[in-house]
Amino acid sequence: MSAPKATILTADEVRRAMTRIAHEIIERNKGAENLALIGIHTRGIPLAERLAAKLSELEGVDIPTGMLDITLYRDDLSEVAHQPIIRETQVPFDLGQRRVILVDDVLYTGRTVRAALDALIDLGRPVGIQLAVLVDRGHRELPIRADYVGKNLPTASSEVVKVKLHETDGVDSVELWDLEDLK
């Protein structure tokens, strides 16, 4: 396999971006009371857990976290596979009294977030929903935007943003690849 075109964020830059997002969440929500973070499979989950830990550290309150599988809510399910892999959805708290922050690694077309919103609403009716992403690469196909962004990264549609996290990949980094180099 070839190498990435560029390393967009190093481990230290990922850490700083997550810390900044945590501070922005606190500022916008006037604290961390009644917040809950829900990570979208796969890399949104460790990012949500990291943000919850940072928010707890900064505000001294426990922030519940959950995980959301959007597989059955995708609008391209028939194109993905005959046997889609269904992963666990786990939201061990009542959504009704919470402001939920959905967390994902990359925001691209907006279709994943649309599916996540549908899945979340099927679980309950939160007070409000916000979106935090590590990377926003543009190319939206739906009217969706992130409330909190670690890095805005304009890309070509022939490029791929690969987020690597210590929990899933053994290292923290964000890389930019040419799509053809990944085939």
Swiss-Prot record:
GO terms for biological process: regulation of DNA-templated transcription. Gene3D superfamilies: 3.40.50.2020. The keyword Glycosyltransferase applies. A motif (PRPP-binding) lies at residues 100-112. It catalyses: UMP + diphosphate = 5-phospho-alpha-D-ribose 1-diphosphate + uracil. GO terms for molecular function: uracil phosphoribosyltransferase activity. SUPFAM superfamilies: PRTase-like (SSF53271). Its EC number is 2.4.2.9. Keywords: Glycosyltransferase, Transcription, Transcription regulation, Transferase. Belongs to the purine/pyrimidine phosphoribosyltransferase family. PyrR subfamily. Regulates the transcription of the pyrimidine nucleotide (pyr) operon in response to exogenous pyrimidines. Also displays a weak uracil phosphoribosyltransferase activity which is not physiologically significant. This is Bifunctional protein PyrR. The gene is pyrR.
